[in-house]
Amino acid sequence: MSPQTETKTGAGFKAGVKDYRLTYYTPEYETKDTDILAAFRMTPQAGVPPEEAGAAVAAESSTGTWTTVWTDGLTSLDRYKGRCYDIEPVAGEDNQYIAYVAYPLDLFEEGSVTNLFTSIVGNVFGFKALRALRLEDLRIPPAYSKTFQGPPHGIQVERDKINKYGRPLLGCTIKPKLGLSAKNYGRAVYECLRGGLDFTKDDENVNSQPFMRWRDRFLFVAEAIFKSQAETGEIKGHYLNATAGTCEEMLKRAAYARELGVPIIMHDYLTGGFTANTSLSFYCRDNGLLLHIHRAMHAVIDRQKNHGIHFRVLAKALRMSGGDHIHSGTVVGKLEGEREVTLGFVDLLRDDYIEKDRSRGIYFTQDWVSMPGVLPVASGGIHVWHMPALTEIFGDDSVLQFGGGTLGHPWGNAPGAAANRVALEACVQARNEGRDLARHGNDVLREACKWSPELAAACEVWKEIKFEFETIDTL
């Protein structure tokens, strides 16, 4: 093992390697309101005590290194070091522990998710003394969160911009995700928006490929938006993906979207990076654009139970970096997502104050103070039969996004959109009348089918479609 010792006033420098726990394991420490707190799930190597492993995590993610260095004496490690202040075994797991680490605020640059993550989830994740390490949760104190702008606009401002209240918003990802020409792509957008959707979406893969350059796509999509608005009398939008190979190109695409007068653009925040995302978020607030966020690559980071970063941490990071929507899983669709865990980080995205609740995976009470909220987006393998459950689970402040569940309608895109809109409004009305959607949701849809042939056709097509697999990431 390897670490660093604290050099106290009057003590001489003693070279060598000493246990991390001598300096970084401090069970007597009382956390401060200004500390950033982290909960790590750690699996030590055989023979490594959990106290030493927890101290190593605190050291290597803050001021420590593998040996004592004489420059320790030029600063105050006691002021700047991370501290492992508690360790608890994980119930039902062999040799797994939750290590709680407190970091002083001065370790991190203000307003920089990039710097925060570089320290807390940096080199320590490759540390040999650990078989595996996962960051389960972070407590971001108001003293730090107030250094971030957060979402460009937030939930209430978005509703005011698009003039839609009292129900979830409806979206659709255009399929096939790759291969359409810009003109045919715009046609699909128009049909979906005219049929009753609020938004359509670029797939996360769509940037500027040879079959459809970004500028052509933006032009045809803008035409589709304005035509559908004129015909329906509703404000419509399409998530134009501004993600690009450089920040300069990304901002150029965002500027062109603003010139066209569209209401919303999109970014892949993990593949694009937090620095790029924060820059784009600032641009969107300054220029009145809503910002939809896709989480492509998240499962590489968050799906394994014992190593990586839980999505609740990535969700908090996005709220600080900036985005008005983010994909959050569906609970009922084709993508990973256990109900209570999903609802836990959905609350972390939307609410101002979230109490500690280990039953939902929330390790710390989180106070966002006045930071705007983010709309969770349920997307992936959902169709009209899921509408009652989605309405009940996610509530009004959400975006329900049906790709194949719109474009796969046997009568075409516009009827597919109409089916989803009718299903949603029927579920919202039934809920508002006091009906239990968990028990009577299917009956609500069958009743609505009597006056919507589009919905009846959709219900017939997808009546047997289910995605019943065991969730990997459980509490």
Curated annotation (Swiss-Prot):
Cofactors demanded by this protein: Mg(2+)
Keyword Lyase: yes
Binding site for Mg(2+): K201, D203, E204
Gene Ontology biological process: photorespiration; reductive pentose-phosphate cycle
Catalytic activity entry: 2 (2R)-3-phosphoglycerate + 2 H(+) = D-ribulose 1,5-bisphosphate + CO2 + H2O; D-ribulose 1,5-bisphosphate + O2 = 2-phosphoglycolate + (2R)-3-phosphoglycerate + 2 H(+)
GO cellular component: chloroplast
InterPro entries: RuBisCO, RuBisCo_large_chain_AS, RuBisCO_lsu_C, RuBisCO_lsu_C_sf, RuBisCO_lsu_fd_N, RuBisCO_lsu_N_sf, RuBisCO_lsuI
Record's cofactor remark: Binds 1 Mg(2+) ion per subunit.
Primary localization: plastid
UniProt KW keywords: Acetylation, Calvin cycle, Carbon dioxide fixation, Chloroplast, Disulfide bond, Lyase, Magnesium, Metal-binding, Methylation, Monooxygenase, Oxidoreductase, Photorespiration, Photosynthesis, Plastid
Site (Transition state stabilizer): K334
Function per UniProt: RuBisCO catalyzes two reactions: the carboxylation of D-ribulose 1,5-bisphosphate, the primary event in carbon dioxide fixation, as well as the oxidative fragmentation of the pentose substrate in the photorespiration process. Both reactions occur simultaneously and in competition at the same active site.
Alphabetical list of NCBIfam families matching this protein: PRK04208.1 (NF003252)
Name assigned to this protein: Ribulose bisphosphate carboxylase large chain
Species of origin: Chaetosphaeridium globosum
Gene that this sequence comes from: rbcL
